[in-house]
Design a protein with these regions (language model features):
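Short hydrophobic/aromatic beta-strand or adjacent loop that forms the aromatic wall/cage
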Residues: 43-46, 135-139
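Conserved beta-strand-loop-alpha-helix junction that forms the acyl-donor binding cleft
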Residues: 113-122, 141-144
Length: 145
């Protein structure tokens, strides 16, 4: 079942990030980010999916508004993850469908995402639900301490 993510979900979100995305995240940072991002509904769309028995978050999609000089308004998916114990049950597809419904209802022209080259299962999933790979690129980052 869909629901909003809140600070009490930080442990589950951190665990999903670790086991599904291979991101080692600090629970306290996840709490801060949940509080910050869920209060910015004009820029961040965060949809959680809970286990109906335990009421715990087992998946989520997080997207941010994307607009530039060269594109119409779109959504950039920053994260889509489902606890591996629940993968293969249509939860990722339901989350994406919910996000797509949001996009259509809000006159958003496209949804885009980046996916690491090694995540071939994810690539197959996205292609299966109608997404196409339109370019391969490198990511550059500069970290400030």
């Amino acid at each position: 079942m869909f629901r909003e993510i809140n600070i009490e979900d930080a442990q589950e979100v951190a665990e999903i990030c670790k086991v599904a995305l291979d991101y080692d995240v600090d629970v306290e940072n996840v709490k801060r980010q949940i509080e910050k991002l869920t209060n910015d509904k004009k820029q961040h769309i965060i949809i959680g999916y809970e286990d109906e028995n335990t009421r715990k978050i087992i998946g989520f999609v997080h997207a941010q508004m994307y607009e530039s000089f060269y594109s119409d308004l779109g959504l950039n998916i920053l994260g889509l993850a489902v606890n591996p114990d629940f993968q293969g049950k249509g939860i990722g597809k339901k989350l994406m469908n919910k996000l797509e419904d949001y996009a259509v209802d809000n006159n958003i022209s496209f949804i885009r995402l980046n996916s690491a080259m090694k995540r071939e299962d994810a690539h197959n999933f996205y292609e299966h639900i109608g997404y196409t790979c339109d370019k391969v690129q490198k990511r550059f980052i500069k970290v400030f301490e």
